[in-house]
């Protein structure tokens, strides 16, 4: 009955928007989600374990030459009428001189049940059962020399109904689960594991925790050294390289380019000729979605071809403006109260041919993990942290008014780095950072054969989004210290 009520509410809202003369196009989503939040610390029982329900409706409205997004957790028809009125009014307030163009001929009718096998769907298990599995997984690390451990588990079983004024009607299901683990003592190590295969993600948890323990033991037993900031030949392990590449490809988002926050355009040199990057959808991956919030089927994008930018990340508006096609890159936020954003999905870096030992011999510093990136350009940092309407034309208008922010650089804290002496592991680096320019991959010296996948979450304009990147190790020159 609850799902039917959400579908009825979404249908009411799309019909209301179809009756608005000012509305050129609109997309409506009805959300029915059951969530679990579990935290396990040093106690042999969960610190917290709660189940949450979400029932709501959102709309993305094209009117008055602008685009606006609104969300409501009320399914009452009067409240939805007010939601529609406010969305149209906000579009009028944000109106631009350039009318928004959209694809009025695109129509989809489909259903997609996600990537969780029927027996692995998350709503088939209770919160207590999930909490017991979390406690069992960390029990061998509690009260040991491994240091303090914390495990965070988040999941949601979500059904979404997507409707638009073209007549599209799509139903999707997603069973998404993620673990975040921290082990702290003489050193602190972190990891994240996420997927959309439902309860099957639990099968990968022991391996993640075992790897976390190995990194912790390796770090605390190593001699420690400090480094003065200097340009060095650096070996980035696959997950460190993935973190770097994921941060750099955000400069290829069409709204970032429109705002003047990117030094790149399509056709520019992004990296060395060794570098090829695709943006993909991997079935069961943490960022896997069958459709984006514009009801576009998610399809692969050739992002960087032998070092040259082959495409940008687009929504339907920016794609039509540039006479190209959108590929389903408008991702919903983890919290639907915040607008969807143009964003990378699964960033896939093609492997190289260099064996691990040769990579190590080429570098003087090796880095296993990088922390969250920080943009040193104050203008870029402030704009990406602020709320911005999900409208590329509004972004372009912001770019015209924004002062020149100066040089773009990104800084990453090192979470697991050490010196290399003739390819062998030396002292551990503590308290150091890596700082790079957006063009750092032009100096890419070597790519490894073996790839690994990093998952996590990132914020863009206050919207929290999942990320996923698969990369080989790489050697490049950058500032470390």
What are these regions (language model features)?
Residues 1-481:
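N-terminal small-residue-enriched
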């Amino acid at each position: 009955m609850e799902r039917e009520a959400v579908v009825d509410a979404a249908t009411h809202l799309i019909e209301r928007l179809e009756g608005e003369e000012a509305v050129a196009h609109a997309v409506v989503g009805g959300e029915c989600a059951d969530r679990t939040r579990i935290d396990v610390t040093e106690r042999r029982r969960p610190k917290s374990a709660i189940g949450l329900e979400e029932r709501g409706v959102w709309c993305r409205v094209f009117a008055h030459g602008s685009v606006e997004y609104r969300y409501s957790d009320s399914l009452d028809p009067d409240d939805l009428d007010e939601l529609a009125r406010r969305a149209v009014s906000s579009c009028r307030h944000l109106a631009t001189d350039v009318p928004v163009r959209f694809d009025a001929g695109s129509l989809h009718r489909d259903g997609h049940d996600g990537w969780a096998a029927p027996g692995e769907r998350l709503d088939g298990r209770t919160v207590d059962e999930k909490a017991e599995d979390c406690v069992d997984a960390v029990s061998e690390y509690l009260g040991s020399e491994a240091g303090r451990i914390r495990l965070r588990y988040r999941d949601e079983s979500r059904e979404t109904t997507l409707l638009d004024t073209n007549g599209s009607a799509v139903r999707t299901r997603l069973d998404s689960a993620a673990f975040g683990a921290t082990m702290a003592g003489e050193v602190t190590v972190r990891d994240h594991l996420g997927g959309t295969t439902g309860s099957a993600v639990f099968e990968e948890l022991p391996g993640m925790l075992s790897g976390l323990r190995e990194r912790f033991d390796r770090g605390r037993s190593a001699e420690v050294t400090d480094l003065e900031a200097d340009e060095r030949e650096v070996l980035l392990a696959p997950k460190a390289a993935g973190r770097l590449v994921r941060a750099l490809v955000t400069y290829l988002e069409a709204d970032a380019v429109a705002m003047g926050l990117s030094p790149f355009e399509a056709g520019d040199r992004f990296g060395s000729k060794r570098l090829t990057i695709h943006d993909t959808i991997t079935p069961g991956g943490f960022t896997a979605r069958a459709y984006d919030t514009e009801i576009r089927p998610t399809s692969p994008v050739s992002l960087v071809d032998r070092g040259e930018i082959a495409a940008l990340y687009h929504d339907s508006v920016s794609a039509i403006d540039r006479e190209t096609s959108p590929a389903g890159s408008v991702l919903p936020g983890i919290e639907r109260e915040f607008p969807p954003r143009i964003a990378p999905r699964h960033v896939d870096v093609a492997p190289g041919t260099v064996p691990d030992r040769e990579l190590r011999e080429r570098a003087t510093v090796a880095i296993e993990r990088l922390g969250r990136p920080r943009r040193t350009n104050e203008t870029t940092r402030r704009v990406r942290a602020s709320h911005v309407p999900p409208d590329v034309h509004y972004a372009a208008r912001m770019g015209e008014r924004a002062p020149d922010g100066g040089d773009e650089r990104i800084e990453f804290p090192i979470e697991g780095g050490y010196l290399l002496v003739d390819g062998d592991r030396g002292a551990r680096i503590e308290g150091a950072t890596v700082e790079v320019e957006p063009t750092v991959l032009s100096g890419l010296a070597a790519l490894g054969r073996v790839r690994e996948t990093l998952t996590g979450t990132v914020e863009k304009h206050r919207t929290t989004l999942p990320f996923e990147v698969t990369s080989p190790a790489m050697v490049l020159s950058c500032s470390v210290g």
